[in-house]
Amino acid sequence: MADGHLTPAPLVIVASNGTGGDMQPFIALAQALQQRGRRVRLLVPGWQEAAALASGLAYRTFGTQEEGQAMLGDPGLWDERKGWGVVWRGLVPHLGAVRDVVQGLPGGEECVVLCHPFLVPMAALGRSVRPDLRIVAAYLAPSNLCSSHDFLAAGSLRIPAWVPLSWRQALWRLLHRSMVDPVLLPGLNGARAQHGLPPEAHFFAHMLAAPDASLGLFPAWFAAPQADWPPHFVQAGFPCAAPHGAAALPPELERFLGEGEPPVVFTPGTGHQHAQRYFSIALEVLRRLGRRGLFLTPHAPQVPQHLPPNVMWQAHVPFAALLPRVAAVVHHGGIGTSADAFRAGVPQLIVPFAYDQFDNGWRIKRLGVGDVLLARRLSAGRMQRQLARLLAAPEVALACGEVARRMGPGLAPAHLLDQVEAALAAA
């Protein structure tokens, strides 16, 4: 440089929203980037401030604890038709959060936003004060890429492989115009107008097109690159197990595991507060199968009050330590839980409620390591039959072993960071 000083590396604003499965990967990426010498600032919802504080990173929050609890307390959050609207209504008052951070930076300081795809509209509003703001969307799962070529499910509607491409494209258009845009566009375009930006015609089209580059945090054997994915797409793979994954199991859980056969794990996801029926059915299924069980949820009131000795409840357990010691895991289809089960080589029964869970579930079934039981069709009889088959089928055990070998120890942190840096450089 002419003045003999090096230009500082751009500040990376890492922004995410959602429950633990959405937050932890972004926090881990932010920590790793900082360890590599990048300047990093987290941007998270106020109800996730404890996670940001524990990360040791500089951070900003948007929204309040009360707003987050109101969202989690809304049963519509786990309805495939209503869920996106519940999340979006909580975000709309805070769509200017990235803009506020960018506006507060010293004049001329470079920055780039690395964000959850659902926060791309928030990041794009930052261009009202910095038109050249660079954005990288990091996709934890493939469903939000809205590919017509690899379109497995529209919510609970399974899309067979024989459906022609033109029909798949038409179905995406119908879904977006009839169910997505009427709910999400008014808030988005209201915020854009407030900040002097033109309106967008379609929500997901904006989400896919606004980033300068995109990053896929899943491997090609789970979702191969497609012709209609965004340009400048860098595909990495599943991140390694969480840093706390090697933590010891609680002593009472160690005793439980040592007292009998490997249990079946049941979890509807950390954010689910409306799973009373799910756990009641799980308890009945365990009784019918004569199996031991482990119920995982931080929300104890939804677990049956009096559990038999062969069933245990825990609020939080490190999956990397637990899952290699269980018979199977019944879960919602969250991508983090799915990857942990792949790594452990255990069968999975997916009970999807909303969001990417359906698509993840059918990909798991396609790999031969699990099955799908739609939440709206959940019954003790169906769960018993599907779980019994998964536990007994030798071909499922073989497929689980093969996928575990593909996973290996996980994507090396250095290699993952190289891919993240490549996406940041492409922006």
Segments from the language model and where they lie:
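Short, polar loop motifs at secondary-structure junctions
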Residues: 44-49, 117-121, 219-223, 297-303
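Donor-nucleotide binding loops and adjacent catalytic segments primarily
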Residues: 8, 221-328
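Conserved nucleotide-sugar donor-interacting segment of glycosyltransferase catalytic cores
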Residues: 93-168, 216, 220-223
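Phosphate/nucleotide-donor binding subsite
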Residues: 58-111, 165-170, 174, 178, ...
